[in-house]
Amino acid sequence: MVLNKTTGVIGMLLEFRCSNHKSIKNEITFSMLAGSDDTHEKSLKLHNGMRILRTAVIYGPNGSGKSNFIDALNFCALMVDKSMRFQPGEKVPQSEHKTSEEGEASSYAVQFLKDGIRYAYGFTIQAQEIAEEYLYYFPKGRQVKIFERSGQTITPGDRYKSSFQQSLSVLKENRLFLACGGKLFQRKRSGGSLSVFYQRSGDLRFKEE
């Protein structure tokens, strides 16, 4: 589930991927999408052809990376929520694996359902700056680009080309574009999917039991 700090469940997590975060070196994937085994088919949630697990457990011995996996997920949410506050020249707090080479990238990507629509968002940090970022959503099951980012260059989807000018004015190398655009659209009560996803992704919070 995707949890809101005050109002409870707001959506369903589908997948989270990360790499080069603390003890996590190579990319790992946590997925709530069911495999081909249909033994417990009645326990699954079905949506637009996806077979989704209702519950999952992360387990393993001490030192296997469970805590750092949760830390990576919470870091992803923290960046969406807080990076707008970073000042020009301030470095992004990248937490590389101890064996990573200088300048090696760290990546984070999340997918979840909200109001029946699937969203996919991710970003890459390199040399303590935002190197790449993207946001898609899937109305009627088909992928639609909201924006893609490479360095300081933003490529909006067709229906968003006239919407992002004010967001670009506050974009910095250490700020996520989602944070810039989401904050502005949230204040205006506009922005459609960008505003909705910003509000939801900023509330991603997980904890160990």
Give the predicted meaning of each segment.
Residues 2-75:
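Pre-Walker A-like glycine/lysine-rich segment at the N-terminus of P-loop NTPase domains
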Residues 45-51, 57, 61, 70-121, ...:
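Conserved P-loop NTP-binding catalytic core
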Residues 14, 106-108, 174:
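Structural beta-strand/beta-sheet cores of well-ordered domains, especially the beta-sheet scaffolds
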Residues 26-30, 117-121, 145:
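Short beta-strand segments
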Residues 18, 22, 112-114, 137:
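Short acidic, glycine-rich loop/turn motifs
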Residues 120-209:
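Electropositive, glycine-dotted interaction segments
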